[in-house]
Amino acid sequence: MPRQLLSGTVLLGAAFLLAGSTSGSKLKVPVLSVNGRQHVVQAGQTLNLTCRGEMLHSWSLPEALSKDSKRLNVTKYACGRNGTQFCSTLTLSRTQANDTGRYSCRYPTSPVKKKRESIVYVFINDTSNPFVEMHSDIPKIIHMTVGKEMIIPCRVTAPNIAVTLKKIPRETLIPDGKTIIWDNMRGFRIPEATYRFIGLLSCETTIGGHKYSTKYLTHRETNTIFDIKLSTPRLVKLLKGDSLAINCTVKAAWNTRVQMTWTYPGEAMKRGSVTQRIDQKNREANVFYSILVIDKVRDIDKGQYACHVKSGPSNKLVNTTVIVYDKRFINLKRRRKTMLEAVAGRKSYRLPMKVKAFPSPEVTWLKDGLPAAEKCARYMVKNYSLIIKDVAEEDAGNYTIILSLRQWNLSKNLTVTLKVNVKPQIYENAVSSFPDPNLYLLSSKQVLTCTVYGIPPPKITWMWYPCRQNHSKTRRGFCSRTDGSFNLKTGSNIGNRIQSIIERTAIIEGKNKTASTLVVAEAKSSGIYSCVASNKVGKAERNVSFLVTDVPSGFHISLEKVPIEGENLVLSCSANKFMYKDISWILPRTVTNQTKARKALNKEYSITLTLTIRNVSLAHSGTYTCRARNIFTGKEVLQKKDVSIRAQEAPALLRQLMDQTVNTSNSAMLECQVHGIPEPQITWFKNHEEIQQESGIILGPGSRMLFIERVKEEDEGLYQCIATNLKGSVESTAYVTVQGTVERSNLELITLTCTCVAATLFWLLLTLFIRKLKRPYFSETKTNHYLSIIMDPDEVPLDEQCECLPYDASKWEIARERLKLGKSLGHGAFGKVVQASAFGIKKSPTCRIVAVKMLKEGATASEYKALMTELKILIHIGHHLNIVNLLGACTKNGGPLMVIVEYCKYGNLSNYLKSKRNFFSPTKDPSLQGELMKDKKGIEPVEGKKQRLASVTSSESFASSGFQEDKSLSDAEEDEEDAAELYKLPLTMEDLISYSFQVARGMEFLSSRKCIHRDLAARNILLSENNVVKICDFGLARDIYKNPDYVRKGDARLPLKWMAPESIFDKIYNTKSDVWSYGVLLWEIFSLGASPYPGVQIDEDFCSKLKEGTRMRAPEQATEEIYQIMLDCWRSNPNERPWFSELVKRLGDLLQASVQQEGKDYIPLDTIFTAESGFPPASDPLCNEKFPVPSPNCRSTERARYINTFKIKPPQRIKTFEELPIKEKLVFNDYQADSGMVLASEELKRFTWTGSKQKWTLFGMKGVSRSKESGLSGITKPRSFCSFSCDQLSESKRRYTYGNTVLEKMKACHSPPPDYSSVVHYSQPSI
């Protein structure tokens, strides 16, 4: 910028006077002593410039020339005529190159608006310094803005110097007068700068062969502000006297200059101090900081604090609010009402609280008294709110927020209740998401059920959609929902008459479920029944395709009669019209062109296609197939009929007529026994005259019999029968002689008639009485989980319910000729179990040993239905490794009904454990096992069997039993030898835990299939190959209270020792009652087959103590962990007992710890454990990695124990039964044997939960207990069943007598054979 030199004060007064005198005239521009716009002076010379003007004036000099320079001198004086003008002379001695620039003379003020000045540009010519400013080493920064003018100030010291502009490294910028303009007074001028000029520029010139250059670096300015933020939150809470520090941080682009300022309440009083700094270490942006600090805040400092940032046209601000409190406090209020509601399935739900506190308190949320965040990983505490992720039904409860300032002893808490509403769920939909359409027999009574759960309890509505036929080409006959629907009520006659709609509610698995039962009185119309369950959060719908059929099974071939050659063959193929279409016949190759198939007859419920073949011959025998297409699946379905044409045969006498002598008034009968094809026509003759049927003469069916009532003398004569058909005729004769008189009294006839009438009435009454006695009673717990709360047993019989379960003959039917029945394995009330060899099980070409359940001879129809019901239930349950699985059945006519299940050759677990009492070892002894394995060549070691079982994966659990090792006949013969070898092996703690774990897995599966066992005990656990145990007798549909075959069939009793209290007193059976029984089963296992409650009299006192919480002591071989599991299973409150899934996990952990302590993994169970649970096997490399949370298969075994070397003391709050001391004549009840059947249902009716204080004896006669503990507890060893060896007993043959009953210890010591040694009862509890 040019500098101004003010004039001296000597002439100041005169100047103002003169200015006043000339104010009225126009001033002239000051005049310089040099002419032109530029003037050249050689370097080192003196520059003289004189300015003459009409006013006092001043000089403006180049920026590099200082006014204080000693080389500069300005002289001011009056000049002109009479001194009326002002002159000043500027003298600059020893001029230099940087003195080059603009020199101007101007008036300091002007009476007119327009300024007046005279300018001359002076060049100081210096050949050694051609540029006024030299920047050779460090370039000068030039700020540029794209699109605006930019000056590159490479000014020269002489007007005629040629300058070249270059952009380093190689580009030369040539002035073109437009984009680049050269000005020797200013340098290079660029009117509109672009990105082209960004970079390092150089001005170059050459003088006297020497090259000179000066460099400039262009700098593009921006106004980009990336981010602005404060170090404090939007709301800052402080206590009086606290310090406040707010840091305002700005991120801006490179080449951006920012200006940061603060506005705050104490700004006027300068309450705060501000410090600023810049951080250019960031490669992406410059970071600017402005920090406002107030040492001790007061009330005046509360308010809004704002940080303002400006860069060119860009303006931004960020603010925060500061609140100053006088003291610390907590205020807590609800934002909403006390009862909050959420919907299950919601992704997130917030429990809000209105909190005002200082300072911020510690926040704790409790759910039902326990820390919420620890209780569930889905709970998150954010600020003062609790956020529940993926809301579930179990999230309902009481939530308490606790705010505390422990340092100052301040706290507040508030509780709200969360209700989780659940959309209606229909459990039948869960069982079958896409149910196949059901066929219902015409005029039959049908029951439809809908089991619903929801919160609040849903309203259930039944709708009816009549069928309409969709006449499209591809789905003709398909029954689809119509637009019109009808609301159904009891007594509705729309479509089908509704007999009743009943709703029942029950608590199942802790949920209050409602079941609605729709009873269709008579199936007449096809359509869709829709069960709609709705509440305020949603609705669910279940559609049941109700297709009425007059054809058995919906697709059937009927044959009018067995054809004879020469007759017509008529076959009718009928199919339900809503299920099938495109019916056609497939004929044997031998059938010729005389075949005639009529056009399909479309009836109300079905389509019938009749096939007629006239004048058939033997060649027409064969298989006739009717083909139809299933409308729903699109698959072709075939129905076959084997037709055998019978050849014609001439009549032949099977027996000749015999001469008879008949008394008068008696009756005579002649029978013409002939055979022929076709059936011969029989004609009777007397004395060669044809006999016609008339009063007193009766011709039997087909005229085969001739019956003469009250024979007379004239009936005597020669009787002849002639049998004739197309092939010929045959005859036979006999003479009937009549003797005696006709003098008889009519009293004989009257007496005979009355006797017949009386006998008929007596027989009718006897028949009705017997049928009433055999009428089945039905329980309140049915075969299906859904039926358990649905049907009134008196209203819908069990067999009718189970008729709804399907039986797929193509999958399960096995020809009887493929079975070779063997020895008997057991028997029940009306059935028996036999061993059999089966060929072709699951299409295998080899033989397999199986167990076959069948009825005894003389079984009734109801018993047949019961076994058929069991078959259907077993199919419904499915397959699992640890249950006795169904393999097939024989149901077709022509033989007995047989249910084929897996054969477990080692018998039941109870007998097996008893046989191993003398061979129990806590750990495995490899040397002992090796010795036993050497005794028989070719026997696979136990470890080898486990390795073989490792190939069994859980993927087969629903398709097979887990064992695909079908045996040949030679293998079957070695079963007993293999069983004997198993009895030689010692029993270990690992085996006991393994049995417990497997039973828990099997029960977990059964409970998942909604199956309740109700008689879970060691006698109902069978031992199979590879130490695999299987649960049996779980699929029997029978009510133990109402069925007379079970309750009072001889001395059969209820399994009281294994029953839960709620089952004993209230007859409640569910999964949790099975858990109780499982705890008793654990006691049996770890007592090595002992009878539960040893030495305890099973009477009312026992039941009362059981209700009060008295439990069994720990068995001898149980560890603390095992006994704790038993106590958990025996909790009085069923809801507090663990689920079977929890028991599987706990026992799986114990089993894994047990086997790993021996340095190996349990291969069979580990395989199953890995496939189903997702845990890695212990041999998996993943186990070698460091997991933050240990896997059950990778955990340490340091805490594992095998044997209870000391007496386990139960918790003090658990009372245990004390064993009764043995007295000389102590007699125990006979019903404490291992069969476990005690107390008939009539006696159970006397018990209630409140109990009776009066003690009375349940049994009048007492017998000897066959259990170790009850009969021999005082004289036997703790581990051995016998105090003597079997050899010693055989020599001494000692017998111990109690009362009148003798217990042979020889039998007690003898190991049972590898067979089913217990009775298999069919009359078991239902699921």
From Swiss-Prot:
Modified residues (Phosphotyrosine): 1046, 1162, 1202, 1231, 1316, 1322
TM segment ranges: 750-770
Keyword Kinase belongs to the record: yes
GO biological-process terms attached to the record: cell differentiation; cell migration; chemotaxis; positive regulation of cell migration; positive regulation of cell population proliferation; positive regulation of MAPK cascade; sprouting angiogenesis; vascular endothelial growth factor receptor signaling pathway
Residue numbers on the Extracellular membrane side: 25-749
Bias type Low complexity, positions: 951-961
Residues annotated as the enzyme's active site: 1015
Disulphides: 51-105, 154-203, 248-307, 450-531, 573-626, 672-721
Glycosylation sites recorded in the entry for this protein: 48, 73, 82, 98, 125, 247, 319, 383, 398, 409, 413, 470, 512, 543, 593, 615, 663
Processing and modification events after translation: Autophosphorylated on tyrosine residues upon ligand binding.
Catalysed reaction equations from the record: L-tyrosyl-[protein] + ATP = O-phospho-L-tyrosyl-[protein] + ADP + H(+)
PROSITE patterns attached to this UniProt entry: IG_LIKE (PS50835), PROTEIN_KINASE_ATP (PS00107), PROTEIN_KINASE_DOM (PS50011), PROTEIN_KINASE_TYR (PS00109), RECEPTOR_TYR_KIN_III (PS00240)
Protein family membership: Belongs to the protein kinase superfamily. Tyr protein kinase family. CSF-1/PDGF receptor subfamily.
Protein name per Swiss-Prot or TrEMBL: Vascular endothelial growth factor receptor 1
Source organism: Gallus gallus (Chicken)
